[in-house]
Swiss-Prot record:
GO MF assignments: DNA binding; DNA-directed RNA polymerase activity; magnesium ion binding; zinc ion binding
Binding locations of Zn(2+) 2: 833, 907, 914, 917
Keywords: DNA-directed RNA polymerase, Magnesium, Metal-binding, Nucleotidyltransferase, Transcription, Transferase, Zinc
Names of the cofactor(s): Mg(2+); Zn(2+)
SMART domains reported for this sequence: RPOLA_N
Protein name according to UniProt: DNA-directed RNA polymerase subunit beta'
GO BP: DNA-templated transcription
Organism name: Pelobacter propionicus (strain DSM 2379 / NBRC 103807 / OttBd1)
HAMAP family, A to Z: RNApol_bact_RpoC
The enzyme's E.C. designation: 2.7.7.6
Pfam family, one: RNA_pol_Rpb1_1
Assembly behavior: The RNAP catalytic core consists of 2 alpha, 1 beta, 1 beta' and 1 omega subunit. When a sigma factor is associated with the core the holoenzyme is formed, which can initiate transcription.
Region Disordered: start-end pairs: 1389-1409
Amino acid sequence: MEDYFSFFDKPKDPLHFSAIRISVSSPEKIRERSHGEVKKPETINYRTFKPERDGLFCAKIFGPTKDYECNCGKYKRMKHRGIICEKCGVEVIPSKVRRERLGHIDLATPVAHIWFLKSLPSRIGNLLDITLKDLEKVLYFEAFVISDPKNSPLQFCEVMSEDKFLKAQQEYGYDAFSGGMGAEAIRECLKAIDLDELSGQLRTEMMESTSEAKRKKTAKRLKVLEAFKSSGNKPEWMILECIPVLPPELRPLVPLDGGRFATSDLNDLYRRVINRNNRLKRLVELQAPEVIIRNEKRMLQEAVDALFDNGRRGRAIAGPNKRPLKSLSDMLKGKSGRFRQNLLGKRVDYSGRSVIVVGPELKLHQCGLPKKMALELFKPFIYNKLEERGYVTTIKSAKKMVEKERPEVWDVLEEVIREHPVMLNRAPTLHRLGIQAFEPVLIEGKAIQLHPLVCTAFNADFDGDQMAVHLPLSVESQVEARVLMMSTNNILSPAHGKPIIVPSQDMVLGAYYMTRDRRFERVIDETTGKEKIDAESGLPIYRKVKGTGKVFSGPDEVRIAFDAGEVDMQATVKVRMKNLVSDEKPQMIDTTVGRVILKEILPDSVPFSAVNKVMNKKELSNLVDTCYRMADNKETVILADKLKDIGFRYANLAGISICLDDMVIPEGKTEILTKAEDEVKEIQNQYTEGLITDGERYNKVIDIWAKATEDIAKEMLDNLSKEKFFVEGVGVSEEASFNAIHMMADSGARGSHQQIRQLAGMRGLMAKPSGEIIETPITANFREGLTVLQYFISTHGARKGLADTALKTANSGYLTRRLVDVAQDAIIAEEDCGTLDGLVVSSLTEGGEVIEHIGDRILGRVALDDILDPITGDVLVAANEDIDENLVKRIEDAGLEKVKIRSVLTCQSRRGICSKCYGRDLARGHSVNMGEAVGVIAAQSIGEPGTQLTMRTFHIGGTASRRAEQTSLESRTDGILKFINLNTVINAEGHHIVMNRNGEIAVVDETGREREKYLVLYGAKIKIAPGGAVTQGGILAEWDPYTMPILTEFSGKVKFGDIVEGVTMEEQLDEVTGLSRKVIIESKDSDKRPRIAIKGMGGDSADAVTGTIGRYFLPVGANITVQDDSVISAGDIIAKIPRETTKTKDITGGLPRVAELFEARKPKDFAVISEIDGRVSYGKDAKGKRKVIVTPEMGEPKEYLIPKGKHISVHEGDHVRAGEPLMDGSSNPHDILRVLGVKELAKYLVDEVQEVYRLQGVKINDKHIEVIVRQMLRRVRIKDVGDTSLLVDDQVERWVFETENQKVMNEGKRPAIAEPLLLGITKASLSTESFISAASFQETTKVLTQAAIEGKVDYLRGLKENVIMGRLIPAGTGLSSYRNIRMLTEASEPVAQAAESEDVPDVSQQEAA
């Protein structure tokens, strides 16, 4: 009887396990799990469609094909449950066991598992110390291996050819040793290994060995050994005696019509194995010749290889259609494998998709859902309500009713969808705002209506985009959708904490038009309908705007006057305003009518000053931000909706449109062009005379045109933004223009100055497909029209833009995927980790300009120590206090230049990150909550703009966006010039010439505070002496941006050394000019070192013998600018190194740059950096490299070898600091980490990544990049093991290393020593603790092989592994501390229980009393 009841039991909770272990299966395990041996290759009988007995689909082994029915039909239905039929041997149970029952194949000879053989490094090879090549020879029957040398002089595991083996047998006798071929022999070898003994041997070997290579190799072997030791796996299990057979339902065979079958590739692969295995058994029974048996064994090995991993060795086995068969490994690997296709992303029920249209009348929390779609999505809910209401009695009748669409159904639908949020999603979902929840509003038609303000977040437009709708079913999911995902709760962007719900396009234009002011308007002639023109000046006649200068007693009066038509929207008026924020008395305020009308929609807590200005897109964004900070979320949502309405309304009333005459071409255009052409001719002449090189000429020409384009654009914008007119009684006057194109660009509604430049200025320089700039610019603009040649030149750029877009989208998506993968387990795990470490943050400056103020960088962070006012010593911010907007203002007012804050990088939490180190949750505006998945947010914030930018490259239409190179520094303030570690010499003209690389100049005020600071280039000419007075706008320094000079510090006579024509130097003849110049070339003779020596003219402290006072080595490619034996003075240029011809900067250079930084790749020509502070001297050359020696004040000098021909940027006798480059080139992040440590590296990475995004005008908060960098720095490399169980060169998690050391130190032993390790994001993802997460990322087979050998346990701590296992993720509401909270739906039970328990006072008795 109990059997029957158990039928209704719920299945076991799928979440009741807490960890998963993977290990190598032993033959016993395989047989134990199997339900029978598959002996025949047959599948099913083609006539009866019943499975063949003992075949691949056998019902006896795998279970019945029909529920509760045996194969021959003797036993049917539930009553015979569990009986085994005596006729056909099939158990009477549900057919679903065919999805879980395994079979097995007993092999006639052992075979090697290809994963352990071929997955590099080969594990079998590592254990036996045989190379993969030899191992394959043995396994595929081309060579013999000695499995037991006994007492012969042969080596264990020695590999030899057949001839040698036979010779040895003759020499030592047949029983003197044992050996063989194929997997059997290898299995014997593996069995013979004593893990403990070998491990001990290797450890001693490692201690004693001197060569680095040997130690590394031994360490690798030890690693595999230790893995086997600790996991309890036996090495011989890597050789298979029997193979498991997958359950048949997982490799189905489906009959098609016409008598054919569609089958899974696995069946073919299994059939091959079974056929070959059976043939081999027969051959062995028949005692066939050795050759034939060997061949058959080899074929069996190949068949098993193909089954496990087809194509890994040799050619892939192809099916009948010439397509390689999909093996077990292929089922797991790649985008369409099990992990990524079915476990990490599934298709779901209760969803639909449709085209979107704009819904301007919706509220922010609503979306329009087509009735048809709602009816389908909410079906079960509708059936339930219909039954509840008594309209129907059965589900069937409810179904009919809904199909007929009776009026009752629509009423019920209205009720069902009330307050039931739905989720809208637009692909590609690049950040979390790509899925948001809305309350549905039923609409006619078939398109989903979307609120215009959320388009930015979805990156949606209405040109045919589609969106998907999903329905949260359970009460919990509805609560989450409403509280966390509702569009009204996602006003701020998680990437930078500024509002993302901001009016755009028409709405901006409307608000901008409302809040503009004007004093005069044009006069239209009643009769002609055209504007009146003043005869004398030829300018249009304007008159005063209606209502200008009127005074009102309050905003309501303004509204009445405006509605009555007495004042104009843009009229400037005076209004008496109450200040609702503070209780000051009302004031008279100068404003415009439009601004007063806009004030009506503001909440009381936002002051009028927030809208008393011209509202462009940026100001509107600030307004929403201000409202969010001053009022609350609800007020902000209401404001956003009102802004939308008022924006659309007044954009409509403004009636702004574009016409050709709006594109005003500047009058000075021809003049600027002629001037530029003349300059180009002049440069050309200089080149023909040989004064400059071709590269310099090209760079200068490009520069002239870039400047001309900028000048024309500037004049055009000035023209557009102002208009001149004639006013009777006033005369000629001008004020800001109401030109439609200018208004659109100025307000930020549509278009950019770049685009207007192309419409009405000149298109400018274009790039070739290779990225170089074509030196003839397009001088026309779109209004004038392009000539055929100009049009042809511009097609390059346009096409490149389209091609880039396609490629970059994929690249950016891949970057995001890697970032998410590396950061997925960075979760807020605790309140405070109690660290005493943090980062020092200061303002970011570039070229003396502050690009990011300290305030923006510390906002939303937590102070590490008390922040004190430098003058009064008061505490501005207490330690561990969140720095909010008010505190930022206090810090900035106090003039602090550096602030210590807590950072994710220095957080001491073991798993995850603590709330204090992270700071503010940018999307919510308060301290971050426990369980927030900050890693994924960081990854999305960095990845999302990547795709945005790459999708947007082509909008400029391929114009080369290149600025004229900066050639001088101008001062921004008055003050006194100060040199900061700057070496200079005074040249013949009396200017200071900069002679070192990291020098800076600063302008200080009377009190000595630095007002501005600039890095100055080597070779720059400083115009003012130190301590000299600086005036604002005065030139401080000048330099040539196209060449890198080599300067002399001494005056004297030039003497060439090793500069031999045809050996180290060649005279390059310029085709065009016929003049030659001396260029250093790479010389075959490594002893030759081209240099220029300066001989003293007497008086200088010269070298006594040679008279040399200075020597300068010349790199390859340097152009010599002085003659031998000529006389020069200090500060003169003796040679020039041309800089690279500039290519256009674009995120196409940017995205790969970001990827390069996060992958921690070594740059191509990276600079060697000094590891210590000290003085520089040159040593003897070695192996064609130059030797630079850095000698510190105390301690050993360090030597660096620098490749010949690279320009060394330090001179003999210079003082260098640790981390300073000794040559030109980009920094290598690994060097920075080694020399300067974690914080400097983090600073470098954050700044570099930010620079790429800043170029594109994308804002990302620093903390996101820090989170990723933290994940890249999680591991350390062991340098010295001490008394720990770690291995040399092992990479372990930092906290594992620390715990291990703590343990050893507590016992009073020697701790291990390690160095920090910087892993690229791909490497870091693959080396996570969880093998499930790593396997689903990349290199699936490799990860699983390693995990199996180690017997790894996955404790399911990250997000990905839990998604794969189908559990709640341990973040957000799935955090383990929240998981145990359950919702009680029926409220009756707990109360009843409570009444039964003792400690509850009985209410009824109390009432009676």
